[in-house]
Amino acid sequence: MDDPNQCTIKQEDSITRPRPTEAPTIQNLKQEPAIEEGSSSTMDNMLMLTIDTNQANWQGTYDDDEMDLNNKTDLIPLLETEKTTINEDELYDDEEDDDDDEEIKKGIGFELLAQALGMSAKVPVEKEEPEKERAKLSGVGEFMKQIRGEIKPIQKERIVLDELGFRVRDPSKFPPCRIAEVQQTLTLADHQDGIDLPPPNAPTDVRIVRKLIRQKMVRCKKCKNRFIEKNIYERHLRDKHPDLYEEYIREQEEEVELQRLEEIEANRIEELQTGGFIPPENEISQPSEDPNYIPLPGENNGGLVPRFDYYGRIKQLKRPYKKKVSPQCPFCDKRFRNEFSLKKHFAKKHEEMVEFQQCLKCFKCVENDAEMANHDCELTYVCFECTPIRNLCTDNRLLNHRKKFHRGANSGFRCSFCNMKFLTPRKLRKHKKMSHVFTKTFQCHFCEEIFISEVAVMTHERMHTGIIKFECKVCDFRANRYTAMEEHKRDEHGYVCAICHERHAEYPEMKHHVYEEHGGYLAADEPTAYVETPRMWILYKGE
């Protein structure tokens, strides 16, 4: 009986195989007959071999009958060596993906080996997972593995925060702010000048300074730009975003109405806490409101009287006047009525600053664009008590600004005539010019009454001296002024109707009375004292 370990090979008579001219494909290899059942384990291991076509290079034809079995047995050590090599390569099969050409070479080498042994075999095709097949066909798997091999581990950076919660920076790149030094200098200057100003309350960290400035700035909802002046923000909305400007106006009106209601509620709570509110005497003396009273047009809506056009359609009402913040000079802190006045001020007082530019980081004003790139952008001389926050650029300007606007309990400039206080010297001068412009006064020689002109004093003294210049022609009334005599004639005498003896102070009223009540008209169109005509109606003047 044959050895079971020995291969059973089916031989055919004079099998002659020519040299292949083309490399067989996988489809042709699949058509070869499979190995018969009962083959040994050696053949099972042989199925996993991969032999290059160069190792199976043969020429001519051969017959299986003439092949010596010893030659077949000589191939067994070679097969075992290749088996060991293949088993080692299988360890890395999960890490590398073979190309389609390598699969073809695998089938070609196995067929040539089987032909050399005089057998036919079927190339085993390993079934791969669908994901690996797609990755192999598209090349994504190999590419992703290359990427995974090149990714470096993430380096964690340690961030250190200071006591304020900000990130600690390199002091060479971020030098310390000089705000504390400037505040100490201002305090010493205040004591030297003898002015008791309150100590400046300003942060010393430049990051907190920038945060405070951003909080006090107004930001546009649409373009996210920031504005330090509210009037500039309103002009920006009016010119760039008209739809937002209308909404902004409505919000301002609602805010004003809300403040008014809050004030009324606060007054009501105060009345409840204090036990009632006692109105002043002048309000008590006034008559109570009549419930049947019909208000005049525009009386209850702020004086806005509706207007109608020729066709009876109501006209568009004008928006009520609202006080806006006047523009201010960034160099000398003066405010003006409008932008035109501010431009005139620039041309007159700051000729070199007509085309100035303002930095949006430190809010300094420079002459032109060239100096904007080279200016010292720092927040050192900042006044935090102003709204909006102002950067005065120099210590001298900051000191003068605090003396002028932030004097604490001593703030305000007092008028020497009426003891009123004003915020700036300019407002004090304006008050004196408007209220105390009359430097000369004229006093009556008979009493202590004072007049602003000599003519007024002479007219008043006629009452004491008895000099009479005007006498009434109807009664014995006398007056020293013409206006007083005219008032007497109109009030005491006036015009009397000849029919019903009704009295009227003005001639047009008398004329209208005669036409409406008596169905006639006056004989004369001029207010003559005595008129006699053939007409029925006679007009009398006086009693």
From Swiss-Prot:
Coiled coil: none annotated. InterPro entries: Znf_C2H2_sf, Znf_C2H2_type. This is Zinc finger protein tra-4. Residues 1-38 are annotated as: Disordered. One of its GO terms (biological process) is regulation of gene expression. Residues 10-20 have a biased composition (Basic and acidic residues). GO terms for molecular function: DNA-binding transcription factor activity; histone deacetylase binding; RNA polymerase II cis-regulatory region sequence-specific DNA binding; zinc ion binding. It is found in: Nucleus. The keyword Zinc applies. Probable transcription factor. Promotes normal hermaphrodite (XX) development, in concert with histone deacetylase hda-1 and nasp-1, perhaps as components of a complex. May cooperate with transcription factor tra-1 to repress male-specific genes in hermaphrodites. Synthetic multivulva (synMuv) class B protein, required to repress the induction of vulval development by let-60 Ras signaling. The keyword Cell inner membrane does not apply. Keywords: Metal-binding, Nucleus, Repeat, Transcription, Transcription regulation, Zinc, Zinc-finger. Signal peptide: none annotated.
